[in-house]
């Protein structure tokens, strides 16, 4: 920088301004003169001044003569008061430039600059070290330094010449004391910090008021290079350069750039009046004032200064051993501190908060949105350094490292760790670099030379490598000798000789080297999307990584730890050629993650942080084998570092062959991990690799079935990945016992890298630990249960025993948690039990055949019983305790509700989902309105239904009139709408009295045919029958017979008349009867046979039925016991009737139908292009498929299927259009055709016409892509016929024509929701359909998924503005228990950022998803995901986020509980309180007749 300028070194050497005339006289003369002259002056200063008293020195001549004496007096020994008086006089006189006093001679006051310049030169004599009275000299020196500080700070009269003399004075006194080797306890050691502090402070003041010329800067740089063996020099330099950097960043990048905060004490070093240009110039010059800080790693360079050379030769002229200088033992720590200072500067330019060990941590303030701009270079172009190195870098000789060397005692303790990562706390995510940070090339142009040189300090490279001088260590012959002697010393020598410790050996420069490596890693990890880095920098960086990650020959633990700590996002930055170092990182991870103790790293770093960073790197490596397949990675140097020419590492390896190594690392990490955060990250990675493997194999199978061949897709089973390269890596790298990973590998040796093998390994590992190590940890348990739920959805065929193992482990976990002592029961514990029941439901719905096994069914039902009642009926060998004998005592109502939901799932959903009506609704798509509309009887209305309630939990709506469908009209039928806790179900029931065949083949109620009678009855004989036999007439009469007279004997005339009348009447009657008999016989002969009048026939069948009464009676609901009020209970009877005529009844029934049967979630998807910051810019991106990447549309299709909002019976993303079964018209099909012909992009899924939808048996999700309000309407009206051949357009017809999975039960003829379909979600929120009740739907979590083309734009995502666009209407419902407040913090809104990489993989950033139970899986911050698994993992993460939010909510009630509460409310409001006779009477009455007009 100052090569064309001459140093002032010769000027300083030739300057005799510090000598006096008295130096020409004998010492005794000078001492006596000085004592005599100085004493009166000093005594006058010590006494109070009297007004009017005259100064002893009046003329210029007197003053100058006295100053000659004082100059000599400053060289005297400190045994008397002379030197003190001299110092007092001079420190008083130099204040003439600040505030003149009476004690100052008048000539000095008149010409202060001239005299002060002379005084400063004289004061140099005070700082010459003396052999005795060191404390007195230190005190006097401090007095002078304080006076100098005051002079520089407060003087406004100093001329440039005085400033220059002052700077030279400070340089000279620093050089006098600091240039020689440090003597322990000497004056230099005590004054070093103050000396260098005053020098830098005064220099900064001079820059403000009188900027030093280049010769002064060059002189300062040369002199400071001679003082670097003092720790204080580097410390003070670091403070000054950090303070300057803080000011520089403030005006260079503006207030939006993260402020680099430094302690107030350091910031005060920079004068407030220093302008920006001065700050920039001063900063760059101060940066280079320390020369090359890498020199600090070479004792030979540090000891080659003139002052060292003076002591390097002893009296006899023989060279002294270099390691005899005790001050050199501080070089490793000084080197580290210099690297730490540079590291802080780099972090400041990157905008990363990184705590410093020496002062308050610099923390960034709010990062406001600023436009992206090019980095401002503070280096003048003509001064920018292009050199590779500033000192000689001879090739280092290869030498073996002794045992004592390898087992050296570490000089750092864990309490003062030399390494630190930007993420110091486990709960806070790593800070992102500032969006407006400089480019990587700019930072490397400024700091790269130093950092790369420091990163290769004392590295030993293989002889076969073509070494560049810029890549090797700094060496000289003397330093080689130093290292040779140090490395050959035995351990006994190090321990017995207190003059040596571990920090005297070159390997202890590892701390500084590690700091440089970590800084470079952070620089390259801060690469912006699309940024180009010079190949020279990339090659050196990869060389650094390969060197730092070596584990075969020599492991440098600090460097290895630093690289790992600072490289988590390294494989997420699209660095060109980064895959070259993948094998080396894998080898490093094999050293770190399976090691439980990490004892070799504990003295350097926090093991938990090291493991976390290793896991982050592992997360970014896992998709590579599947993604690149058989692509070969060139292994550059691994074999050469091992000195084994036959090593298999020299051979190129395929990425697929690394899969087994990565899986084993993952398994080993899970077995040894104890930190909850790290464990959850591993669990998320397990689901990622299992699902990716399953999808890849499924694609491979499809291609094989289709006849296609693809080497990159079908290799999973043919190439197991066990190659010579991967096989060698499984050997233990530590002398400990065999790692668990190898033991597990033996258990699953066959197909261990297949999807089925991975799934089995994952289930075994997770279930084993869930009921052992993890069951006490809530966060890990929850993540493990989420992993098991995800594994249940992986479509891979595994043995039923493995699936049963998962179900059994969840049951065992529930039993353990429920059986814990009462004092340990808490809401969090019950949340875990609820989560376990939810996991159990997932497994049962995904694998319903598991309940075909008796043992599994018994275990599951016992767990349900335990959750509902609090105990099992049978425990071990105890007697069975029946339900009626048990007193219900569940762990909590939440647990009971979860168990009831599980029971409902078992009884109603298993094997019945999805129903023929589709997955959009587990309920029947039928209600009263639908039945009325399609009934054939016009008299049917809503009052034609009878409403009953069973057991206070099920509402029955019975329609007795037939519907006119396929039901047989001859049999009694009833249509029942069953509204229970699980939803609304419609049953059409018919009383079946005959088998199905009899209905078709037999005539009902027709008797069997009879034979025709014969009219020929044979001959008829007329025989007169006598009442008595003939013998009666022959019997003679006796006297008694004659005692009764005959009739004529006693009849008188009057009686005769009457007798005759009677006789004639009888004759007439007989004739009439004979006539009738004849007539009857004639008619009888005319009739057919059989006589229909007299023939016996069966009664005709009933035509009108009261089927509701029959239904209730047949099911036993009409017993007297069912109608009685239960004793000692407030519950209603088992059967009650509801009065549907009470106003508001049907509104409440509709309200009940709107209560969802499953949890519902909403995801809003945004697309963010580079540089965008406003919500309108982001919303407009989805208006055309040409403005988004093709993978984005593919991603949308992987989330769910397209549904029409007007026809969809499930959740649509807004309450105004959800769960409706009567809201579509026939005109929508024509509109669909218009939409299909236009390029409206993903905005079709904005919730106006369509949304993306996903549902399973337990949850439903709506994926909404918000767009501007007018986008869809404009596209329909414009009729633009632009048919450009764009690749993205090919995807849209598939999206729009995708068949809906919902079943259209009936064609709908109701009016469409025109008002809501042309409004954005935020506008629809304020326009709900009139008359439609909206129930309080409880807690709602709105998850946002953001596709960002440029990763740095995450900082600019306007989440607060877009909150208005992600309304679902739930937050506006009345009495909503968790309606979103206007004060909702942005950090509480879960956001999943997806950034596509150039490799075709995707980088994940999670924001706001960390809740009470820590992070959510499977997606983890920093994870890399493949195209295949992206949709599944995002969807699963959304489900888990929302489930966790519901678990954390104090007011959340499951859907079945809310429905049960509403049913109870309906019963209480509309119960028909009738007496038993009245109830029975009402059953025989017709319903609906009096309300036909309504």
Swiss-Prot record:
Residues 355-437, 709-738, 1312-1335 are annotated as: Disordered. One of its GO terms (molecular function) is GTPase activator activity. Residues 1149-1392 form the Rap-GAP domain. The modification Phosphothreonine is found at residues 363, 379, 734. It comes from the Eukaryota. The modification Phosphoserine is found at residues 359, 421, 720, 1285. Keywords: GTPase activation, Phosphoprotein. InterPro entries: RALGAPB (IPR039930), Rap/Ran-GAP_sf (IPR035974), Rap/Ran_GAP_dom (IPR000331), RGPA/RALGAPB_N (IPR046859). GO terms for biological process: activation of GTPase activity; Ral protein signal transduction; regulation of small GTPase mediated signal transduction. Non-catalytic subunit of the heterodimeric RalGAP1 and RalGAP2 complexes which act as GTPase activators for the Ras-like small GTPases RALA and RALB. Component of the heterodimeric RalGAP1 complex with RALGAPA1 and of the heterodimeric RalGAP2 complex with RALGAPA2. Heterodimerization is required for activity. This is Ral GTPase-activating protein subunit beta. It comes from Homo sapiens (Human). The gene is RALGAPB.
